[in-house]
């Protein structure tokens, strides 16, 4: 059977944007509504041309009285069409009540969890979602009203990992015409008209009002979406460009912002925070922007995550408690927080100190206002380009009566040379070597 104009346009979208490849298994998220029923029928008609297998999945959210009707409808339709369908029920109202989240948010989370699990368990490559251009408009408006950045503008994509949206750039009226022209049955979700749900209010109140200003609202928003996608691609290239300046150090992600402009710094801050599962809000971003010209500072992003700056370095880190002191005695390996030392008879690293008498040697944190030979340790660390957020974690090696070594900062001249019975305290490993080595050539030698 030849393709009609709409089906051909969807095929071109799939081929142009490489959404489906030969041999792919595709799982259609099938609610039974107009959009998902049109998507299922189009993909069934295109499956030979695309050389792919089509499956369907339906989650009964147990929210509406007619949910059973919808479940039975999609099951019966797929059975007649020869399409394997996966159907499950999940008590979304209880799920939302237990977690104190909204119905819309909870239903979406449950649905995506279900779809991803079905795809994984059955070796299915792609999940096809029936979002259209009107959905894109409504979602962007919803995100803008709630406060969003770039991620809110590009909230829906034609392809996002294993999810595809072949109908994303088609208007709802085109889908309605296709359904009517082909006599495709569907079910109507009566909650789509309930204005207590934010998306419905936007659909039935806000969008019609905006169309009085621009009758071609959908295409206007598609241009905004396209611009957002271009900007997002630029940010991805930016992250790749500076990837060698981003370091994962223990419970931190640190990046070097030297010679970066404000836009680049903020995008890297957002990226690194995202790697720590933190989504920065507008207020937090503005706070970071306001402090960019300050040399050192700290901002709490959540109960257990903070962002800190020292010199050109930014650190997004988990808050944790650190060991205060560690005694060093017999030869062997010693762990002081994230630092690893070894007391042995040989020099094994570039950072080391000779120990002439093992008695009373310890590794500890610095003390407030502490001085070495009359010079504040803080000033020494500043001269040595140690970022402020690392200074309290720098190990200080002491004998009974004096500080003999602070790695990368200071070595007592009496402990630079080996004596007959000396042992060597080597710094074998520290998670910040990439940072501490980076500015080594800029350091003033401390003696």
UniProtKB/Swiss-Prot annotation:
This is tRNA(Ile)-lysidine synthase. It comes from Pseudothermotoga lettingae (strain ATCC BAA-301 / DSM 14385 / NBRC 107922 / TMO) (Thermotoga lettingae). Its main location: cytoplasm. The gene is tilS. It is found in: Cytoplasm. One of its GO terms (biological process) is tRNA modification. It comes from the Bacteria. It catalyses: cytidine(34) in tRNA(Ile2) + L-lysine + ATP = lysidine(34) in tRNA(Ile2) + AMP + diphosphate + H(+). The N-terminal region contains the highly conserved SGGXDS motif, predicted to be a P-loop motif involved in ATP binding. Ligates lysine onto the cytidine present at position 34 of the AUA codon-specific tRNA(Ile) that contains the anticodon CAU, in an ATP-dependent manner. Cytidine is converted to lysidine, thus changing the amino acid specificity of the tRNA from methionine to isoleucine. InterPro entries: Lysidine-tRNA-synth_C, Rossmann-like_a/b/a_fold, TilS/TtcA_N, tRNA_Ile_lys_synt, tRNA_Ile_lys_synt_N. GO terms for molecular function: ATP binding; tRNA(Ile)-lysidine synthase activity. Belongs to the tRNA(Ile)-lysidine synthase family. Keywords: ATP-binding, Cytoplasm, Ligase, Nucleotide-binding, tRNA processing. One of its GO terms (cellular component) is cytoplasm. Its EC number is 6.3.4.19. ATP binds at residues 31-36.
């Amino acid at each position: 059977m030849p393709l009609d104009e709409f089906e051909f346009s969807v095929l071109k979208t799939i081929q142009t944007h490489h959404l489906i490849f030969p041999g792919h298994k595709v799982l259609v998220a099938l609610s039974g509504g107009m959009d998902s029923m049109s998507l299922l029928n189009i993909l069934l008609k295109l499956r030979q041309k695309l050389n792919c297998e089509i499956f369907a999945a339906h989650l009964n959210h147990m929210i509406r009285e007619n949910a059973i009707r919808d479940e039975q409808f999609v099951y019966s339709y797929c059975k007649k069409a020869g399409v394997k369908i996966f159907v499950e029920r999940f008590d979304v109202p209880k799920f939302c009540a237990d977690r104190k989240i909204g119905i819309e948010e909870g239903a979406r989370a449950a649905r995506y969890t279900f779809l991803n699990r079905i795809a994984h368990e059955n070796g299915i490559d792609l999940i096809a979602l029936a979002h259209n251009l009107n959905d894109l408009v409504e979602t962007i408006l919803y995100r803008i009203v709630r406060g969003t950045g770039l991620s809110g503008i590009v909230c829906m994509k034609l392809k996002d990992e294993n999810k595809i949206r072949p109908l994303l750039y088609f208007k709802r009226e085109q889908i309605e015409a296709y359904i009517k022209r082909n006599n495709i049955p569907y079910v109507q979700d009566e909650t789509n008209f309930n204005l207590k749900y934010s998306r419905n209010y936007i659909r039935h109140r806000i969008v019609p009002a905006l169309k009085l200003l621009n009758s071609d609202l959908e295409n206007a928003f598609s241009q905004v979406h396209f611009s957002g996608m271009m900007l997002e691609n630029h940010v991805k290239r930016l992250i790749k460009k500076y990837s060698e300046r981003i370091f994962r150090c223990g419970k931190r992600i640190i990046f070097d912002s030297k010679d970066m402009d404000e836009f680049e710094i903020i995008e890297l801050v957002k990226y690194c925070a995202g790697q720590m599962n933190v989504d920065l809000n507008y207020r937090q971003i503005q706070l970071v922007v306001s402090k960019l010209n300050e040399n050192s500072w700290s901002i709490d992003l959540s109960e257990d995550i903070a962002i800190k700056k020292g010199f050109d370095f930014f650190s997004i880190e988990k808050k944790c408690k650190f060991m205060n002191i560690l005694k060093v005695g017999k030869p062997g390996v010693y762990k002081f927080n994230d630092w690893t030392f070894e007391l042995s008879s040989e020099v094994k690293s570039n950072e080391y100190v000779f120990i002439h008498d093992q008695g009373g040697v310890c590794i500890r944190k610095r003390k407030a206002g502490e001085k070495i030979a009359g010079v504040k340790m803080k000033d020494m660390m500043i001269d040595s380009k140690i970022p402020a957020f690392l200074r309290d974690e720098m190990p200080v090696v002491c004998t009974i009566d004096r500080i003999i070594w602070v790695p990368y900062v200071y070595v007592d001249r009496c402990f630079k040379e080996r004596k007959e019975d000396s042992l060597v305290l080597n710094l074998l490993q520290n998670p910040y070597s990439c940072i501490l080595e980076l500015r080594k050539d800029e350091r003033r030698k401390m003696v």
